[in-house]
From Swiss-Prot:
One of its GO terms (cellular component) is cytosol. It is an enzyme of class 2 (transferase). It is found in: Cytoplasm. Its EC number is 2.7.2.3. Substrate binds at residues 21-23, 36, 59-62, 113, 146. Monomer. It comes from Acinetobacter baumannii (strain AYE). HAMAP family: Phosphoglyc_kinase. This is Phosphoglycerate kinase.
């Protein structure tokens, strides 16, 4: 993908406006997870080292536009950045008519979603953002799938628009997996419903050599192959769709599964009741009417791990079982370790996937971990991300 990169630009003495994703969880004024802030720091530091006058902006939460509330302010983020950067990072609440910032200095602009017209990508607002800077840097991959004034609009009107290091790394990794994958390529797509991942499955079926499915998605494919899935979560209306996908790409199905007796499960307290449920390993052909499939069995996990070992590119989205409960997490654990130990280029994304990577402590062995969530899925679906499209146009 051809786009301008912040790292290639001369920023000395330039006013640089950086769109980061600083949408961190804040409870009673305290940031409870700083992962996104830690991810953004290298970009801010790089702009400072290049001699720029740096303005950073972001959204936080879902405020009503034009109705700022203190609990949705970026004030805790300004305090965090002040400490992390070793210089005062002032928070500007009134910035649309201009901001005073010197070269080598960083300021933070208040929550963009306080500004009427932000979410609707109002061109007048986008032009006001653009007028603040000489260079606009888009570095928030997690919001790149939304055409908003601070993501797509400003990039149209700024004198120069470039991708920051975080966004560039994300696009490079996704491009490597989706556009020029080294073969053989294997994708792991798991989740509760085929319907929510249908575009992902269709897109990947045209790219990868093997498609490993897990969770409720696998149950729908098992039902399509004529197996009884008992009380397991599956979508009867998508059995034909599963057959069509399986006709396009190799979908290795589980040969054994881990089940629980559905009568022992309280669906109001699903994970709590599962913790007390007995896990039973069964061949897929032995699943009975009252069984609920909650993981792949050890034989299947080993077979899937062997597929991953011989692949050159792995894209992973979703755990193959209810890994939050240990007795139904062995399949996800085995696949996590197989991805980690494979020599393939691996990219992983999606909230549950990241939680599994954390649980099994394999983050350092995954080629690239996408922080994008919805943006990651839309890219994998083959959709154009508006904030990326404008950078490509302006390159």
């Amino acid at each position: 993908m051809n786009f301008q990169r912040m790292t290639d630009l001369n920023l000395a003495g330039k006013r640089v406006l950086i769109r980061e994703d600083l949408n961190v969880p804040v409870k009673n004024g305290v940031i409870t997870s700083d992962a996104r802030l830690r991810a953004a720091l290298p970009t801010i530091k790089a702009a400072l080292e290049k001699g720029a006058a740096v303005m950073v902006f972001s959204h936080l939460g879902r405020p009503v536009e034009g109705e700022p509330k203190p609990e949705q302010s970026l004030a805790p983020v300004a305090a965090y950045l002040t400490e992390a950067l070793g210089q005062e990072v002032k928070l500007f609440t009134d910035y649309l008519d201009g901001v005073e910032v010197e070269a080598g200095q960083v300021v933070l602009l208040e929550n963009v979603r306080f500004n009427p017209g932000e979410k609707k990508n109002n061109p007048e607002l986008a032009q006001k953002y653009a007028a603040l800077c000489d260079v606009f840097v888009m570095d928030a991959f997690g919001t790149a799938h939304r055409a908003e004034a601070s993501t797509e609009g400003v990039a149209r009107f700024a004198p120069v628009a470039a991708a920051g290091p975080l966004l560039a790394a994300e696009l490079d990794a996704l491009g490597r997996a989706m556009q020029t994958p080294e073969k053989p390529m294997v994708a792991i797509v798991a989740g509760s419903k085929v319907s929510t991942k249908l575009d992902v499955l269709n897109s990947l079926s045209g790219i990868c050599d093997q498609l490993i499915v897990g969770g409720g998605i696998a149950n729908t494919f098992l039902a399509a192959a004529g197996y009884n899935v008992g009380k397991s979560l599956y979508e009867a209306d998508l059995v034909e769709t599963a057959k069509q996908i399986a006709a396009k790409v190799s979908v290795p199905l589980p040969t054994d599964v881990v089940v629980a007796d559905a009568s022992q499960i309280n669906f109001e307290d699903f994970l709590g009741s599962l913790a007390a449920a007995q896990a039973v390993i069964k061949k897929v052909e032995d699943v009975t009417a009252n069984d609920m499939i909650l993981d792949v069995g050890p034989e299947t996990a080993k077979a899937f791990a062997n597929i991953l070992t011989t692949s050159k590119t792995i894209l992973w989205n979703g755990p193959v079982g209810v890994f939050e409960v240990d007795q139904f997490g062995e399949g996800t654990k085995a696949l996590s370790l197989a991805v980690a130990q494979s020599d393939a280029f691996s990219i992983a994304g999606g909230g549950d996937t990241l939680a599994a990577i954390d649980k099994y402590n394999v983050a350092d062995q995954i080629g690239y971990i996408s922080t994008g969530g919805g943006a990651f899925l839309e890219f994998v679906e083959g959709k154009t991300l508006p904030a990326v499209a404008v950078l490509l146009e302006r390159a």
